Amino acid sequence: SYFVWKEKPKFKFTSIHFWVLLFGFWMLVSTIFNIRVSSDYAWFKYNEFVKVLALFIFITLTVKTKRDIDTFIWAIVLGLSAYAGMEAVKFILSGGGHRIVGRSGILQDRNDLAVAINMAIPLILYLWSVTKHKHLKIGLIGLALLNVVAIVGTYSRGGFIGLVILAFAIWLKSNRKLLFAFIAILAMPILYANAPTEWKERQATVETASTEDGSFIGRLWAWKIATLIALDNPITGGGFKATTDAVLWRMYANETPDFGPIYTKPIPPELTPKAAHNIYFQVLASAGFFGLFVFLCMLSKAYFLSQKNKSRSKKAGIKWSQTLSDAICLSLVAYGITGLNVSLAYFELVYAMLGIIVAIDANKLYEKPVE
C-alpha cells in the first residue's frame, strides 16, 4: 500500500535507523563469515531477520499519526494479550493445572511467551489511559490482570522475576504509592498461599538453580560456550545460533567446567546443544563483541529517545504521547530484564517498539495536539 500512496510523507532518517541498520549489516557480515558446519541454516535465520528489519522500516514509513499508532498497538494487544488472557482463564478454571505455552511458532516456548506478555502489559495500560469508553476501560483492566495471571501460568521463573520488576517500576511511577503498596501487602500472602504447589516449588529453585536445576545448568553451559565462541571470533562471532551447532558445541564443551566465575560440572557427551537462552549471550555468540556493542547501543538509544519523547510531550502538554513513551520505556525495561532468560534478540515486537519511537520523534507527535 505504501508504494501506491500518492502523497507519501517525507522520510526522516533518525539515530535509531542508524543503529538498527548497522546491526542488520553486522549480522550480514557475521553470516558471511559464520563458522557453523551448516552455513545454510545461518543464512536461513538471517533471511528471517531481514523480514524483521523490513517490519521496522515499514512502520517508520507508514505510521505517522496517533491514530496509526493506536491502531497498531490495538493489533498487538488483540493478537498477543487477548491470547494470554484466554489462556489465563483456562489456568484459573483448572485450579492452576493448565500450563500456559504459546502458539506454534516464535512464541511457543513458555519463557518466550512470558517475555512478550511482560512487554505488552504497559501497552494495555496505555490503551486504558487513552480510551474514553467506560466498559472498554474496565475490559482493558481485566485483560491486564489476566495477563499477569498468564505470566504466572507459564511457570517461567524469569518471566515472574520480570513481572515483579515491571510491577515495581509501574508502582514508582504511580500517584497512589501508599494505596497500591497496602493492597499488595494484603494480597500477596493470600495469592501465594493459594498458588499451585508445583508453581511454588519451581519459583523456590531460583536460589539453588546454579547447582541443582538442570535447566539452569544447561543455560550456564550455553553461556560459557557462547563466550568461548566470541573469544575465538571477537569481531564477527560464529553466526546465527552458533551455540546450537553440534560440532561447535562439542569443540568447546571440554573447556566449560572451570571457565568463568561459576564452576559447572562437565557437559555430558550425549547432551543436545542448547540455545543461548539469553539475548546478550545470543548476540555475543552470533555477532561477536562488536555486534553486542551495536545491539546494546541500539536498545540504549531507543530507551533514551523514548525518555526524551516523554519529556518533550510533558513540556508541550501532549498527555497521550507522554503516556505512550513511558509505556514503551517500561516495555524495553521488561525486555532487557526478561531477555536474560530467552533467545529473543531478533524478536519482532522489540523492533516494532523501536518503529513507534521513531514515529513519535520523526513526526514530532510529542508536540501535536490530537485532531
Indicate residue ranges for each PLM-predicted region:
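Alpha-helical transmembrane segments of multi-pass inner-membrane proteins
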Residues: 24-32, 50-55, 68-99, 105-173, ...
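Long extracytoplasmic/lumenal interhelical loops at the membrane interface
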Residues: 100-104, 209-224, 232, 236-287, ...
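Membrane-interface micro-motifs in multi-pass membrane enzymes
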Residues: 44-48, 106-117, 279, 284-288, ...
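A membrane-periplasm/extracellular boundary helix in multi-pass inner-membrane enzymes
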Residues: 89, 94, 149-153, 171-214, ...
